[in-house]
From Swiss-Prot:
Gene Ontology process terms (BP): axon guidance; GMP biosynthetic process; GTP biosynthetic process; purine nucleotide biosynthetic process
Subunit structure: Homotetramer.
Protein's UniProt name: Inosine-5'-monophosphate dehydrogenase
EC number: 1.1.1.205
Subcellular location: Cytoplasm
Pathway given in the UniProt record: Purine metabolism; XMP biosynthesis via de novo pathway; XMP from IMP: step 1/1
Organism per entry: Drosophila melanogaster
Binding site for IMP: 348, 383-385, 406-407, 430-434, 464
């Protein structure tokens, strides 16, 4: 009788048989056979307490029985918010303002507006995002019959469009009398005093209150009008739909939207008492999620701010951080956070680990915190150290629900700032929020300083970040689809047909890992060539 022993060597299972007859192997239809497990489980990968980064390991391939296009990238951002793609832009003043946040949301992610600016400026940026893709516009700009052509021209300069409903009292809820459009004021630029009552269009196509969005869109499409007013039985204006929004919905079907079909947007605030006024402005402008922006989030200041937000705005989603240990995470979870931001000193422009001797290698931090937070249903955002699609996949494979990107998005046309040339290369500025340049920004009123527990009166500030430049990457609207496509193909290689399935594979032991030596890392990169061009998309 044949006897077989199984020996695990360097993470591989090797079978030895006392008989020379070849062993008959059966193929698993799922690709998962406990007796043929190679590599290490996630728990085994970190069991020695080593500080690992994303480049220190690989994920072993799995079984493919689906196409890459079938991979579902939906993933929770917080307890109540789900993204169509697990991608978040960092709240940095050289990464995310309204233009970046709009692009992120259109592609299924979300942008977090930075707070290194005045509260009014930040609230306006949030407002721009919420107004970009309206769906049902519940608070459209409205004119009255006594408004003039000059008022419409001024509104066009401010808002960027010319079509406005006209009601009896010039307010939403007033009886709808007509519409004024660009065709009504054409050639009247020199007649700013003309009343809208004399030029507005009164024959309108409307839809009844309570109509669903697909039906309303069908009416709008058939009418060939630019806007569709929604009225109640008394003929009073209650909402609007715009044709431009219908076009946007077709171009970006996976956009991240709220219940009103408006784009999702987040904003960062500090933990100082004056940030409560900033928070009120952001909430008034429709912000969907708040990130408490701190390099070390395990503080009495953040705990108190979390409790204040939950008491004052119980429905508002709050993400706490940054944290890198389970003990840090516990205090914020106990305070009531809806999500956690993980990372300390791992960003490309961050020097916290070097200067403060404090932090944690990012892969280890993501695994430890996400494993703990999972028990309480709190999603984790991996923040820092993301340099490629592979790093995004690895962060999620360690338990993160989403990744936050800074340098990966800096240099795109949607990032704040102007391009400049150096030695013929088109560049854009990128700086850490802990850099002296960011902390000394004139209009910020100390917002970036508060992230590192400095204030404007400090005589000496210790920099925890640097300033640099990034090569032009083009538009985020081209770059994000590349990242998402790569993420789908990577999940296919691993054998996970969704982001949620990938995370499940961590905890049932189906996902297998392999540590990489320095030589293995060199082997896995381009080598042996005299010269090469690395084009990613």
């Amino acid at each position: 009788m044949e006897s077989t022993t199984k020996v695990k060597v360097n993470g591989f299972v090797e079978s030895t048989s006392s008989s020379a007859a070849p062993a008959i192997q059966t193929k698993s239809t799922t690709g998962f056979d406990a007796e043929l497990q190679d590599g290490l489980s996630c728990k085994e990968l970190f069991q020695n307490g080593e500080g690992l980064t994303y480049n220190d390991f690989l994920i072993l391939p799995g079984y493919i029985d689906f196409t890459a296009e079938e991979v579902d990238l939906s993933s929770p951002l917080t307890k109540s918010l789900t993204l169509r793609a697990p991608l978040v832009s960092s709240p940095m003043d050289t990464v995310t303002e309204s233009e970046m946040a709009i692009a992120m949301a259109l592609c299924g992610g979300i942008g977090i507006i930075h707070h290194n600016c005045t509260p009014e400026y930040q609230a306006l940026e949030v407002h721009k995002v919420k107004k970009y893709k309206h769906g049902f516009m519940r608070d459209p700009s409205v004119m009255s019959p006594t408004n003039t052509v000059g008022d419409v021209l001024e509104a066009r300069r401010k808002n960027g469009f010319t079509g406005y409903p006209v009601t009896e009292n010039g307010k939403l809820g007033g009886k709808l009398l007509g519409m004024v459009t660009s065709r009504d004021i054409d050639f009247r630029e020199n007649q700013p005093e003309v009343l809208l009552a004399d030029i507005m269009t009164t024959e309108l196509v409307t839809a009844p209150n309570g109509i669903n969005l697909p039906t309303a869109n069908a009416i709008l499409e058939k009418s060939k009008k630019g806007k569709l007013p929604i009225v109640n039985q008394a003929g009073e204006l209650v909402a609007m739909i715009a044709r431009t929004d219908l076009k946007k919905a077709r171009s970006y079907p996976n956009a991240s939207k709220d219940s009103n079909k408006q784009l999702l947007v987040g904003a960062a605030i500090g933990t100082r008492s004056e940030d409560k006024a900033r928070l009120a402005l952001l909430v008034a402008n429709g912000v969907d999620v708040i990130i408490l922006d701190s390099s070390q989030g395990n503080s009495v200041y953040q705990v108190e701010m979390i409790k204040y937000i939950k008491e004052t705005y119980p429905e508002l989603q709050v993400i706490g951080g940054n944290v890198v240990t389970r003990a840090q995470a516990k205090n914020l979870i106990d305070a009531g956070v809806d999500g956690l931001r993980v990372g300390m000193g791992s960003g490309s422009i961050c020097i916290t680990q070097e200067v403060m001797a404090c932090g944690c290698p990012q892969a280890t931090a993501v695994y430890q915190v996400s494993t703990y937070a999972r028990q309480f249903g709190v999603p984790v955002i991996a923040d820092g150290g993301i340099q490629s699609i592979g790093h995004i996949v690895k962060a999620i494979a360690l338990g993160a629900s989403a990744v936050m990107m800074g340098s990966l998005l800096a240099g795109t046309s949607e990032a704040p700032g102007e391009y400049f040339f150096s030695d013929g290369v088109r560049l854009k500025k990128y700086r850490g929020m802990g850099s002296l340049e960011a902390m000394e920004r004139g209009d910020a009123k100390g917002a970036a300083m508060s992230r590192y527990y400095h204030n404007e009166m400090d005589k000496m500030k210790v920099a925890q970040g640097v300033s640099g430049s990034i090569v032009d990457k083009g538009s985020v609207l081209r770059y994000l689809p590349y990242l998402e496509c790569g993420l789908q193909h990577s999940c296919q290689d691993i054998g996970a047909n969704s982001i949620n399935k990938l995370r499940d594979m961590i905890y049932n032991g189906q996902l297998r890992f392999m540590k990489r030596t320095h030589s293995a890392q060199l082997e896995g990169n381009v080598h042996g060539l005299f010269s090469y061009e690395k084009r990613l998309f």
